[in-house]
Amino acid sequence: MALERTLSIIKPDAVAKNVIGQIYSRFENAGLKIVAARMAHLSRADAEKFYAVHAERPFFKDLVDFMISGPVMIQVLEGEDAILKNRDLMGATDPKKAEKGTIRADFADSIDANAVHGSDAPETARAEVAFFFPEMNVYSR
């Protein structure tokens, strides 16, 4: 097992439902530590830059519009196998296909308004964490 960091975003739909604390409890109960966190209302430019990997996909505009529709909670999670652990906690992208008890099964409404984002690999985790948090603002504990 490896100590890893991963980026997690609680998306506008879940923030609006006031379930940030419930989602944080799931992270902590799974052994993940929140080592950086901030609330933000993303600008269109930031959302487009963050999701640039999807720029040519048909859903890109809708994704960006959704991500700027309200505040998000952005956090860095740290722990053993944090990337996989967080992905397991999130569940399938489509909440209808997500296993019962996952964040998306419990809090998401649709494949678009799916409550959370999480890094999918070590390389993307490093880039995504750096996008939102300078190293000096991440505190291992």
Curated annotation (Swiss-Prot):
UniProt GO molecular function: ATP binding; metal ion binding; nucleoside diphosphate kinase activity
| Annotated InterPro entries | NDK-like_dom, NDK-like_dom_sf, Nucleoside_diP_kinase, Nucleoside_diP_kinase_AS
What are its GO cellular component terms? cytoplasm
Which sites are catalytic? H117
An example Gene Ontology biological process: UTP biosynthetic process
Disulfide topology: none
Keyword terms of this UniProt record: ATP-binding, Cytoplasm, Kinase, Magnesium, Metal-binding, Nucleotide metabolism, Nucleotide-binding, Phosphoprotein, Transferase
Which Gene3D superfamilies has this protein been placed in?
A: Nucleoside diphosphate kinase-like domain
Q: Which residues bind ATP?
A: K11, F59, R87, T93, R104, N114
What PROSITE patterns does this protein's entry cite?
A: NDPK, NDPK_LIKE
General function of this protein: Major role in the synthesis of nucleoside triphosphates other than ATP. The ATP gamma phosphate is transferred to the NDP beta phosphate via a ping-pong mechanism, using a phosphorylated active-site intermediate.
| Record text on subunit structure and interactions | Homotetramer.
The record's PANTHER family line, in alphabetical order, gives:
NUCLEOSIDE DIPHOSPHATE KINASE, NUCLEOSIDE DIPHOSPHATE KINASE DDB_G0292928-RELATED
By what name is this protein known? Nucleoside diphosphate kinase
| Gene responsible for this protein | ndk
